[in-house]
């Protein structure tokens, strides 16, 4: 009986939910590709074009590897409180797909911030403390995207396909990790101005946000069980 249950045909709702997961996984590739990419300018661009001394102390570049984790710990309870506030509104919470879109938007704002710093600095070396603001945008993007993306898989994946759908989500992470180095080599190798490369990435992130907002209704129709309404 267990074998028969495992191999039974998927229902229409399950097929729709699988389609939604695959579609959102494509946006996940974009998010994580640009998220991983965000660290490389620190090592190869800002390492030479920023003043890393604060009060006579030279801040190690590696400290910024840990800054995101610290900001996640700080912002985690704050974002949880935000979700509660939104859910308590008369009109209810915003959809998970719009939240994922906002995660991409925060990432795009971070790259715009990168570009603004580079344009405004001219030939000067601005203080490395400015990078803290960039990491704030990076972390906000992660807090909007990562936990909710995992929750999306757990909530809407057919139970007997949960492992496979989790693998599909993981495959998106794998693709992003493989691609971001190539994107950096293409966009930041000197072929384009640093600020223009950052703005282009930001535009892609913003367009992804607009698309997620535009297809929000369609995605909700794919995952919603009419019998539960």
PLM feature spans:
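Intracellular loop-helix junctions on the cytosolic face of multi-pass helical membrane proteins
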Residues: 1-57, 79, 83-89, 215-229
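Transmembrane alpha-helices of Major Facilitator/SLC transporters
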Residues: 57-88, 103-111
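Transmembrane alpha-helical cores of Major Facilitator Superfamily
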Residues: 66, 70, 105, 136, ...
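A membrane-interface helix-boundary motif in multi-pass transporters
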Residues: 92-98, 126, 185-205
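C-terminal transmembrane helical hairpin of 12-TM major facilitator-type secondary transporters
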Residues: 97-145
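Multi-pass alpha-helical transporter architecture, strongest
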Residues: 117, 200-229
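Intracellular juxtamembrane helix-capping segments at the cytosolic ends
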Residues: 143-158
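A late C-terminal transmembrane helix in Major Facilitator Superfamily
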Residues: 154-188
């Amino acid at each position: 009986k267990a074998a028969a249950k495992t191999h039974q045909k998927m229902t229409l709702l399950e097929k729709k939910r699988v389609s939604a997961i695959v579609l959102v996984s494509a946006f996940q590739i974009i998010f994580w590709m640009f998220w991983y990419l965000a660290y490389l300018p620190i090592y190869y661009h800002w390492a030479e074009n920023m003043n890393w001394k604060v009060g006579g102390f030279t801040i190690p570049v590696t400290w910024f590897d840990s800054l995101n984790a610290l900001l996640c710990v700080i912002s985690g309870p704050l974002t949880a409180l935000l979700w509660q506030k939104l859910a308590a509104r008369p009109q209810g919470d915003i959809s998970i797909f719009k939240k994922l879109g906002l995660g991409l938007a925060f990432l795009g704002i971070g790259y715009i911030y990168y570009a603004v710093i580079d344009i405004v600095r001219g030939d000067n070396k601005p203080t490395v403390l400015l990078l803290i603001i960039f990491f704030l945008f990076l972390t906000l993007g992660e807090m909007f995207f990562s936990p909710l993306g995992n929750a999306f898989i757990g909530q809407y994946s057919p139970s007997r396909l949960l492992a496979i759908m989790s693998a599909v989500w993981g495959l998106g992470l794998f693709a992003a990790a493989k691609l971001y180095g190539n994107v950096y080599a293409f966009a930041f190798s000197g072929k384009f101005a640093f600020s223009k490369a950052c703005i282009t990435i930001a535009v892609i992130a913003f367009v992804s946000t607009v698309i997620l907002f535009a297809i929000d209704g369609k995605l909700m129709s794919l995952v919603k069980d009419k019998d539960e309404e």
